[in-house]
Amino acid sequence: MNNLFAQSRSHWVRYDRYEIKTGKTGKRYITPEKTAKPDIYNPLKESSEMVLEALNVGMLMMNRSPEDAVEKAILTFVTHYGLLGLMTALPTTPSFMDYEKVYLPKNHFIRAESMETEDYLALFYPFDQLDLVKKGIESSWSVSGDRTMVALTMTFADEPMAKTMSFQREYAEPYEWVAQQFKDWAFTLTTSILYYNDYNLIDEDTRNLYRMGMAAFGGIAPSYHIELLDKPTIYWDFHSLLLGIQMMFSFLLVDGEKPLRLCKHCQKVFLGSRANSAFCSPRCKNQYNVYKSRGKNKGQDGENDD
């Protein structure tokens, strides 16, 4: 996959500090800290590492790890790469500000097929509202008093308004939604791995259930254009980090040279050097063999005691 994205670029915004805050209704959100500083970066430079970290956050939940460990891992991820951009990922178009309402396909988080724009925005600005005016299909918003936010807005002036709005400090994403997305990605990976590992042990009905589960995984392909830099470069127009991760994860999932694997010992997701790679490190391999050997010896001791 590295070769695929070697001459590719994109951009996203991350802040250097995030926090989990509780809203008036008791719902928890992830949002940049008040004095956090934004940074524009190219997520494609860290594509494999980002996908692996996202999957391993999800695996913590799949393995029922303590909630404080999960929270720490989620905050670490968003500090590394930014929030997922759920506000622009969920609607039928990231340019939803150009329409009278927000239209939503089926998703895990919002049951309504359409929402008033103000009501939809309120889901992502529970603490501080933006200076926004919306009348029909016309909308405008202004940023003043914070030079950093003004500069950030001007940098993304040609992007969909909602995407630029999601880079502001006031933007927040529901913690449970973010956590669920990580868990969904981990579930997709384990479905794929179990399907092939257990293929000869399961019946055709069970195989079909696995296939149906995988068929539900997908997304709208991002648009792209070519930029003439030091050499021709593909520029991917990700309107949400979620969409970017989804695409990168998809390519890794079908990569036969360096397949995504689950460590047989620690259950960590890693890129295998070959198709039958079973351990993420020599240490895990050694520990697994030691525990396996102890288990055999314990069984033999029990037989001798009889």
Regions found by a protein language model. Give the residues of each.
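Short helix-coil boundary/hinge micro-motifs
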Residues: 1-270
